[in-house]
Amino acid sequence: MALHVIVGAGPVGAATARLLSARGEEVRLLSRRGGGPEVDGVELVAADATRDLSRHTEGAVALYSCAGPAYHRWTTGWPPLGAALLRAAETSGAVLVTTGNLYAYGAVEGPMTEQLPMRPNSVKGEVRAKLWTDALAAHEAGRIRTAEVRGSDYLGAGTLSAFTALVLPKVLAGRRASAPADLDAPHSWTHTGDVARTLVAVAADERAWGRPWHVPTAPAMSLRRLAGRAAELAGAPAARVTTMPALALRLAGLFNPAAREMAEMQYQLRHPFVLDSSAATAAFGIEPTPTDEALRETIGGVREPAAPR
């Protein structure tokens, strides 16, 4: 039994904790409130990771970054957290495996592979690019061992995205939904359980370190098709979804910080956004969770929200 430390008790952090516990590992899950799954082998710790992380990672073999500052606080919240993760990885010797996303690639044409250069076209993309650049530089200098696991918009219980926040609740209620998207553009949706499986696989294989990996993800599905399938699985009326004008989102941003931050990321929903995850499937044998299964879990999470973490 070895100690694995997870920072962040959201859907990915919780799924990673459950997976490691089921494999008989010792797990320490850190979050500001000390929440998380109450299962055998998982120690729940309330801590400020920007200040206390090195103390909690002593003796760990792996450190998983599954946390994230509030969307509107990325520019101020991520730098100290990223620095704390690097310090903890260096002092403990634990391999640092970070939960990333696709923001750093910017707008691209065609499916996204791990070989794409980072060309962010948003403030949040620049933040993510610097986090990886700093971690990779420390890895190449021999100070730490690291890798990054990148997924697209999440499906799963408790996940937050344009689909789960703006579309799914209204579809389940039989109401018309609106989203800032090309409703028929293909879009990749990543299941949080698959993120956890990839994090654990990468941490365990030193051949996987020093590079990014894309989470095995089911074939792309447009927002319209996803909403329609969700309605069918939930036994709800046929989904009705319309495109939200860009101006409407900007106006909402005057009063809602999350909506304001979504504005610069609209390109991901208004154009094809497809993830190529074949490398991770080939390397680790991880097959993506079928979309129907991921949707059922997501629907269950909306209908029965978890307690605050």
Describe every region a protein language model picked out:
Residues 227-274, 307-309:
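Terminal hydrophobic/aromatic helix or amphipathic segment near a protein terminus
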Residues 159-166, 180-203, 210-214:
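Substrate-positioning beta->alpha
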Residues 281, 289-309:
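Amphipathic terminal alpha-helices
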Residues 35-36, 41-92:
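NAD(P)H-binding glycine-rich loop region in Rossmannoid oxidoreductase-like domains
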Residues 83-129, 147:
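Conserved Rossmann-fold NAD(P)-dependent oxidoreductase catalytic core, especially the SDR/UDP-sugar
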Residues 101, 133-158:
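Conserved beta-loop-beta element that borders a ligand/cofactor-binding pocket
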Residues 158, 186-193, 215-233, 242-250, ...:
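Substrate-binding strand-loop-helix patch
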Residues 12:
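Hydrophobic/small residue at the entry helix of a nucleotide-binding pocket
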